[in-house]
Amino acid sequence: MEIIVDNFAGGGGASTGIELATGRNVDIAINHDPAAIAMHRANHPASKHYCENVWDVDPVEACGGRPVGLAWFSPDCKHFSKAKGGKPVEKAIRGLAWVAIRWAKLVRPRVIILENVEEFTTWGPLVDNRPDPSRKGQTFRRFVHALKRYGYQVDWRELRACDYGAPTIRKRFFLIARCDGRAIRWPEPTHGDPSTLFVTGGALRPWRTAAEIIDWSIPCPSIFTRKRPLCGNTMRRIARGLKKFVLDNPEPYIVDKRLAPLLIQYHGEQSGKEVRGQAIDRPLMTADASNRYGLVTAFISKYFAGGYQSAGADVTVPLPTVTSIDHNALVEAFLVKYYGQGEGQSLTDPLHTITAKDHFGLVVVRGEMYQIVDIGMRMLTPRELFNAQGFPPDYIIDRDADGKSYPKSAQVARCGNAVPPPFAEALVRANLPEMCNKSECVSA
């Protein structure tokens, strides 16, 4: 029987997707990071694990004469990603993809799938540890030529995880190479924008959304009672996000008639007044190896013409009320000071002049007026981030096979570096149906 090899990244998302498609564990899993191997072993105990540099694993010895049906490669993407910015890059790390050529030469996998960031096609020589713009893509073309020289047909595309059932817009580059004479196949999207005819007509399911991944039972503490006040940049993000996704939204997303949530990015500034955030009823933007997302909740209560009358006991579910103190005045002061102002100001300073708006923090929900009575914020949990990547809800992320706990930072890092499992499942089903179980893709 043909075996499956995964030179995986992060928490083992490709292995998970492959398992969902085939109904079996990958046979060989390779990663240099002990923490990544520990998480993989906890979830895929039947795999043979190599905690080594990919160049130190002998493909012939590892396979032991068994034919390879699929070899998956997720070489480190940090030194290709635009998120790297203008920082110097390392030639050795950028060259990790060449290990796929070694496997093609020595054990000739029937199908090779390589995953990376979209900038992978710009792979070229370096000058002073920076990409040489005059030779952009030169090394990538050599890489493709090497695969073809060993008898592989090659094709590549960029895909979005939300189109295959993951509640994130994460975009990735995929290269498929095969040497069995069969055609390379790209999976058809299963999900789409809910406003398009493809979805309204029933051809596709609607994108899964960020709202699905959030545990609404976790408290969201008030931004006004924190021991350490939030910095001005974060306050501006919150205010701009509330303005765009709640106050100015004709149809704000409301949870159980009690709160209006949104997500903000906790780092990464944009110029001007651009909002670094998103509505909760869209797929999550790309999650990286650090937790950049803050859940902001505007607690709302019915607004009466005579003014705000109650802190609203109904806000206790599904998120417990932040405090019994009336924060209405603080909410109004906050919105006045940070309502899209370019610089903003501290809440301890005198209020800016209130201009044309008579009321701040009023939200219209299905024709009824509500008022924001408090604002909470918390970071997304590692479990929520794994949910956004499309991992199964029972995927073990907080401990290894021996029960040793991982810190949250390690959990988030494994998540951000992982392949969303729905990608791998869809690609394997499209190209290796003979190895797959008969059920359709499980991504809802």
Report each predicted region and the residues it spans.
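Short beta-strand element of Class I
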Residues: 26-28
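Class I S-adenosyl-L-methionine
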Residues: 59-70, 77-327, 332-346, 352-353
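Conserved SAM/SAH-binding beta-strand->alpha-helix loop
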Residues: 33
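FAD-binding beta-loop-beta segment adjacent to the flavin cofactor pocket
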Residues: 372-408
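S-adenosyl-L-methionine
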Residues: 38-65
